[in-house]
């Protein structure tokens, strides 16, 4: 068990390499073209700043300068 105390990080690296290999294999199975063709429509975004959208303090382009 002394070797486990010294070389525990090697087991962690082997585990992480295994996870990365499985992620890569799973991502290769994803058909992104099929997903993009059947992509669901997103609902419109609603923010809570809409009450300030009307009273915008940016100058209008059509207004003459004072």
UniProtKB/Swiss-Prot annotation:
It is a single-pass membrane protein. Belongs to the UPF0370 family. Residues 39-66 are annotated as: Disordered. It comes from the Bacteria. Keywords: Cell membrane, Membrane, Transmembrane, Transmembrane helix. This is UPF0370 protein CKO_00315. NCBIfam families: PRK13664.1. GO terms for cellular component: plasma membrane. It comes from Citrobacter koseri (strain ATCC BAA-895 / CDC 4225-83 / SGSC4696). The chain crosses the membrane at residues 4-24.
